[in-house]
Regions:
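Glycine-rich FAD pyrophosphate-binding loop
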Residues: 21-50
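Dinucleotide-binding Rossmann-like beta1-alpha1 core, especially the glycine-rich loop
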Residues: 51-110
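Short, solvent-exposed loop/turn segments at secondary-structure junctions
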Residues: 11-12, 39-40, 108
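Beta1/beta-strand and adjacent pyrophosphate-binding region of the FAD-binding site
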Residues: 1-12
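Hydrophobic residues within alpha-helices
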Residues: 16-20
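Gly/Ser/Thr-rich beta-alpha loop segments that engage phosphate groups in nucleotides
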Residues: 10-15, 44-45, 60
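Conserved SAM-binding loop
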Residues: 5-6, 34, 61-62
């Protein structure tokens, strides 16, 4: 029996656990434990409702041109929860001194 430690319960750690769980389902002799320092899984990814709006933190999207992400969502039973973007409303905001400030179109941060 192989014993595996997964350090961190963010998207990478959870993806590793998912792949290991699939291997276990086919008979692989694997035990794994996820070690996460915070009280919740998800790493920097989170969603909160603030005054009726969903506020996303961390990466909140993926490119559907990369079919593996959409395929994984469908495999996990989340395919019907994928929400396409509305290009006419696509805008990025940051919080500066407690206020939302729209970022200029096309601005990229390193």
């Amino acid at each position: 029996m192989k014993r595996i430690a997964i350090i961190g319960g963010g998207i990478s750690g959870l993806s590793a656990a998912y792949q290991l769980e699939k291997a276990r389902a086919t008979g692989a002799g694997i035990e794994y434990t996820i070690f996460e320092s915070s009280p919740r899984l998800g790493g920097s990814i989170s969603s909160e409702r603030v005054e009726g709006c969903v506020v996303e933190a961390g990466p909140d999207s993926f490119l559907t041109e990369k079919p593996w992400a959409a395929a994984l969502c469908k495999e996990l039973g989340l395919g019907d929860q994928i929400i396409g973007s509305n290009d006419s409303q696509r805008k990025t905001y940051i919080v500066v001194h407690g206020k939302l400030v729209a970022m200029p179109d096309g601005l990229m941060c390193p």
